[in-house]
Design a protein with these regions (language model features):
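ATP/Mg2+-dependent ligation/transfer catalytic cores
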Residues: 1-155, 176, 319, 353-363
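Active-site neighborhood of thiol-dependent amide/isopeptide-bond enzymes
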Residues: 170-182, 205-206
Length: 363
């Protein structure tokens, strides 16, 4: 969850130059003790935006400093370090994130229920009625995102009841992570104002598709050329050798990437082998690579990669950093893709999966 302090406008300069002080021991995962120095959240003023659902407020993203230096446990700083590795090569990782979420409420007994009890189809994906009945929340969230320069281009009902996805254009990895953090804040607050709960829980219903957050990936040059694209690719996937090596790095580190992309116990209910009531989980259970194959961990929309492992409960900074580290390892070692899987992995038995040399993700 995002941590914050409210600062009057007169204190903004101090936050940018010195930082707002936190007791680091009170923030989980910072590796600090109660007798240690303060954790100083130093604001990056380039990220300053209004908070559309709270008139008169603004938001600025910070990086933690301890003793005047960036704190190595700060996840945004972790990503900045990996981004620098790319910049040293003249590259930028572009990521397009696809957050999925459920709209719920509590009944009189305190039990979680769908906001829309009529959203009960076995195959609700792209359902018009379900989308229309939730339009007030979706419109308010979209307007809030657009007010801070998100280019929202489509909204749809997903494959679980009460599940939706909002798509917005890609950006560099650091900006994308900042934006998704803002997205979760906006969705939660706007839902609360409407008496709803917006849940990014990876698998709220064991019988339904879970909430993923697929990462679309490409590397661009200093001239903004997509270095993952090669029209001469004989496979027809439009990928360069660089892209294949990067993808092979993701596959090689698939189990380890779960620690970042699937960070909770509930995450592994989403990655389970098997199907949902609709016939597909839309989540990968196998370490596989395929052309437009949504049952694989790495899918190839023409000329780029889609990493389907992450769920919507992840830390986007850590996932992005891990993606860069794994991909660069694949590039540095010139790893190759052993097998292109163009089959529906949901329909194969575990024996058939093993025969193809495909490994299973941690379960």
């Amino acid at each position: 969850a995002a941590k914050t302090k409210s600062v009057p406008i007169c204190g903004l300069k101090t936050v940018a130059e010195e930082g707002a002080g936190f007791a680091g021991f009170a923030i989980s995962g910072m590796g600090m003790e109660p007798h240690g120095p303060d954790f100083m959240a130093r604001g990056d003023l380039s990220t300053l935006t209004p908070v559309p659902w709270q008139p008169g407020y603004g938001r600025v993203v910070c990086v933690g400093h301890v003793d005047g230096k960036p704190h190595p446990f700060d996840s945004r700083y972790v990503l900045q370090q990996q981004v620098q590795r790319l910049q040293d090569k003249g590259w930028t990782l572009n990521t397009g994130l696809e957050p999925e979420f459920n709209l719920m409420r509590r009944d009189e007994q305190g039990k979680l229920q769908l906001v829309d009890p009529s959203d009960n189809l076995d195959k609700p994906c792209y359902d018009y009625k379900g989308l229309s009945r939730s339009r007030v929340f979706l419109e308010r969230l979209t307007e809030a995102l657009q007010a801070v320069d998100f280019e929202v281009y489509q909204i749809d009902h997903e494959d679980a009841n009460g599940q939706f996805e909002i798509n917005y254009t890609y950006s560099d990895a650091l900006t994308s992570a900042d934006r998704f953090t803002f997205f979760r804040m906006a969705a939660g607050e706007i839902a609360n104002d409407l008496g709803m709960i917006c849940s990014f829980m990876p698998k709220p219903d064991p019988k339904r598709a879970g909430n993923g957050m697929h990462f679309h990936l490409s590397i661009s040059s200093a001239e903004n050329k997509n270095l993952f694209h090669d029209a001469s690719d004989p496979s027809g996937m439009g990928l360069s050798k660089l892209a294949y090596h990067f993808a092979a790095g993701l596959l090689a580190h698939g189990p380890a990437l779960c620690a970042f992309a699937a960070p909770t116990v509930n995450s592994y209910k989403r990655l389970v082998v098997g199907n949902s009531l609709s016939g597909a989980t839309w989540a990968p259970a196998f370490i596989a690579f395929g052309a437009n194959n949504r049952s694989a961990m790495v899918r190839v929309p023409y000329g780029r990669l889609e990493f389907r492992l992450p769920d919507a409960g992840c830390n986007p900074y850590l996932v992005s950093a891990a993606i860069i580290a794994a991909g660069l390892d694949g590039i540095d070692r010139e790893l190759e893709i052993d097998h292109v899987c163009n089959e529906n992995l949901y329909s194969l038995s575990l024996e058939q999966i093993a025969e193809r040399g495909i490994k299973t993700l941690p379960q």
